Structures are given as C-alpha cells and as structure tokens.
Amino acid sequence: MKVIFLEDVRGKGKKGQVKDVPDGYAQNFLIKNGKAKPATTAAVSALKGQQHAEAKNAAAELAEAKVLKTKIEDDKTIVEVKSKAGEDSRLFGSIPSKQIAQALEQQYKIKVDKRKIDLPEPIKALGYRNVDVRIHPDVTATIRVHIVAE
C-alpha cells in the first residue's frame, strides 16, 4: 500500500515522502497512529503543491536575505557603538551581540536577531571590528562595527 508520511518514522520514511509499505503495517500502525495517510491521487497532488509552495517561499527568503546582505555590507554602513573606556583604549565591560543588534536597528533601521550575530568573544577594546551576521543558513554578511569612547 502506498502511503504519504505525515511525520518521520524511523527506518521507514521521512515526512512528505511517498512510499510503498505492507498493507497491515500501513493500516494498523501508520494510519491508525496518524503517522501516514493513504496516497490517493488527490493527496499526492496536494503534497506536490505544498512542496512547490515551500520551495517558492524558500527561494523568496533567500532572495530577501541577499538583498539585506548587500544593504549591510555597503561601505557606508558602519555601526557605531559608544561605551565607557579607560586611557589604554580598553573598555569597562564589553560589547555583546545584543548591543550591536540594537545599534544596527537604531542607526540603519535593520532588525537583526542578536543570536544571528557571530561574536567569538565579546569586544573589549576601542576601534573597528568586522562582525559576521548569519542572515540565512546560506547567507552570511559582514558588518563594520566602530567602538568609540563616550
């Protein structure tokens, strides 16, 4: 019997996959527990339509991420963060990714989640830094951050 998996079933199939399984297994376990449904022509065409829509949305997200990357990596986009510093240009405390995200939103109206800003360690000195931002799993942008003393 052909079924469409509604969720991942270990050793049998992944969500959205159409597969031929034994009749008893399909009727008594997969369909009964809501893990799969019979693969009728209507169900298969609906699945293909859904997969097509998901692919279209993924392509739109990727295009949007690339536009945002060009906006972030523009030469004029330098995020300025002010912090208290000592005489040897070391900061009192540090600059975390949250503060960089807030400054980016205030200065350029670009909203980026703080978890997407990739700081190996917090910034602890004045000056310019290049910071990576993971906008999309396939798109990473680099922003210039200028740390200045208050």
Swiss-Prot record:
Q: Which PROSITE patterns match?
A: RIBOSOMAL_L9
Keyword tags: Ribonucleoprotein, Ribosomal protein, RNA-binding, rRNA-binding
GO BP annotations of the record are: translation
Organism's domain of life? Answer: Bacteria
InterPro entries tied to this protein: Ribosomal_bL9 (IPR000244), Ribosomal_bL9/RNase_H1_N (IPR009027), Ribosomal_bL9_bac/chp (IPR020594), Ribosomal_bL9_C (IPR020069), Ribosomal_bL9_C_sf (IPR036791), Ribosomal_bL9_N (IPR020070), Ribosomal_bL9_N_sf (IPR036935)
RNA-binding listed as a keyword: yes
GO CC terms of this entry: ribonucleoprotein complex; ribosome
Q: Name one GO molecular function term.
A: rRNA binding
**TM region(s), chain numbering:** none
The record's family statement is: Belongs to the bacterial ribosomal protein bL9 family.
List the HAMAP family.
Ribosomal_bL9
What is its biological role? Binds to the 23S rRNA.
What NCBIfam families does this protein's entry cite? L9 (TIGR00158)
The protein's name: Large ribosomal subunit protein bL9
